[in-house]
């Protein structure tokens, strides 16, 4: 029995005495304790060593007092499981080989046994659940198919996604085939994370805003919908968050994926989002991560503004406080602690 289930209750739009808070990338470089672990190993080895992944997953729970933990991993483990070589090169970025550009390339990708290929993630989840000892829920996650597709086709990050879009526009059937192959792997991966002990799931579509609204509806949303449906078919009680970065103009479509919660970027007023979606999903967000460079007073005033904009809770509303994207690596940890403590205290008046 979880000692603190506020996060899960908020996702299900059940009443809570205050607004729960966690932040994306909360296990990361801004923490000296994380850097101490990271100095001893490279990033992917850290992801693949359950004891280390568990240690850094729990750090922000111990040090910052957040209301949920998120398993330490990377979205590109799915691409690697499908047969791509993934390298994360310090100061140079991400390189995936081979780039997936042809039918033959797609055919060579495997439909992996996720238990075999991604067992280290499930081991890390099991170990973390044990070590958390029911203090807070644990979030499992995956990248969305569109975002993983862009990495596969581009062979890394991209400024304009030219190769990914070339495939979309010239060979749409091929693009859909690759997206479907990735989606099947994601669904299996998410279900196994829940089986290992994840209490909730987040799907990150980091490069969502590279697409127009219509293209997002065609090449991204149907696959997210499949992932949500797969998790819900196996585990109807497990809440799913969809974070489609900066797709503020089609929030209603994102909510229609069947997700319990929609993650918001910082460039939308949360009051507008709540009004548009009319409390049919929980909202997660949405402070600009750079606010954490500010003074404690500024951090508190910005957090207070978001809580006030969301407004008074009803018996069917839900809000999880978060940033609009990941915490930046050079933020002072004391500033995040200030935010967490303030949100816990200030939010009670709206419940």
From Swiss-Prot:
Cellular compartments per GO CC: cytosol
GO terms, molecular function: uroporphyrinogen decarboxylase activity
Reactions listed under catalytic activity: uroporphyrinogen III + 4 H(+) = coproporphyrinogen III + 4 CO2
Protein name: Uroporphyrinogen decarboxylase
Major enzyme class: lyase
Purpose of the protein: Catalyzes the decarboxylation of four acetate groups of uroporphyrinogen-III to yield coproporphyrinogen-III.
Classification via InterPro entries: UROD/MetE-like_sf, Uroporphyrinogen_deCO2ase_HemE, Uroporphyrinogen_deCOase
Organism, scientific name: Chlorobaculum parvum (strain DSM 263 / NCIMB 8327) (Chlorobium vibrioforme subsp. thiosulfatophilum)
């Amino acid at each position: 029995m979880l000692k603190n289930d506020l996060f899960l209750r908020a996702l299900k739009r059940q009443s809570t005495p205050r607004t729960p808070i966690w932040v994306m990338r909360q296990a990361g470089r801004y923490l000296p304790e994380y850097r101490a672990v990271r100095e001893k190993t490279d990033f992917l080895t850290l992801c693949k060593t359950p004891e280390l992944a568990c240690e850094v997953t729990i750090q922000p729970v111990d040090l910052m007092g957040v209301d949920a933990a998120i398993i330490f991993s990377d979205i590109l483990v799915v691409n690697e499981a499908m047969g791509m070589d993934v390298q994360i090169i310090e100061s140079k970025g991400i390189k995936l080989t081979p780039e997936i550009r042809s039918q033959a390339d797609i055919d060579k990708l495997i439909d992996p046994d996720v238990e075999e290929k991604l067992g280290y993630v499930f081991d890390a989840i099991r170990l973390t659940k044990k070590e958390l000892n029911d203090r807070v829920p644990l979030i499992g996650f995956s990248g969305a198919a569109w975002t993983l597709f862009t990495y596969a086709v581009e062979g890394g990050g991209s400024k304009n996604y030219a190769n990914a879009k070339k495939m979309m526009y010239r060979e749409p059937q091929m693009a859909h085939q690759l997206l479907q192959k990735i989606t099947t792997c994601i669904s299996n991966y998410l279900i196994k994370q829940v089986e290992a002990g994840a209490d909730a799931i987040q799907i990150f579509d980091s490069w969502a805003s590279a697409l127009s609204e219509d293209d997002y509806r065609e090449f991204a949303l149907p696959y997210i919908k499949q992932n949500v449906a797969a998790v819900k078919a196996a585990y109807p009680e497990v809440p799913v968050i969809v974070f489609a970065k900066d797709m503020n103009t089609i929030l209603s479509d994102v909510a229609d994926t069947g997700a319990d919660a929609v993650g918001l970027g910082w460039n939308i007023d949360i009051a507008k989002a709540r009004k548009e979606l009319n409390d049919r999903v929980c909202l997660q967000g949405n402070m600009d991560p750079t606010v954490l460079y500010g003074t404690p007073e500024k951090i508190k005033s910005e957090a207070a503004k978001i809580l006030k904009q969301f407004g008074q809770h009803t018996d069917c509303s839900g809000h999880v406080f978060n940033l609009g994207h990941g915490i930046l690596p050079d933020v002072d940890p004391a500033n995040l602690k200030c935010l967490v403590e303030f949100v816990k205290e200030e939010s009670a008046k709206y419940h």
